[in-house]
Amino acid sequence: GYEDEDEDRPFYALGLGKRPRTYSFGL
């Protein structure tokens, strides 16, 4: 979920900050 830092970590590494879902990309 949004609070799962382990899930967000790959996206932080890509410079996206959070998972694409947090940007409403429809993923």
Swiss-Prot record:
Any one GO CC term of the record: extracellular region
Keywords noted in UniProt: Amidation, Neuropeptide, Secreted
Record PTM Leucine amide, positions in chain: 27
Similarity annotation: Belongs to the allatostatin family.
Protein name per its UniProtKB record: Carcinustatin-20
Key word Secreted present: yes
GO biological process: neuropeptide signaling pathway
Localisation: Secreted
Task of the protein: May act as a neurotransmitter or neuromodulator.
Tree of life domain: Eukaryota
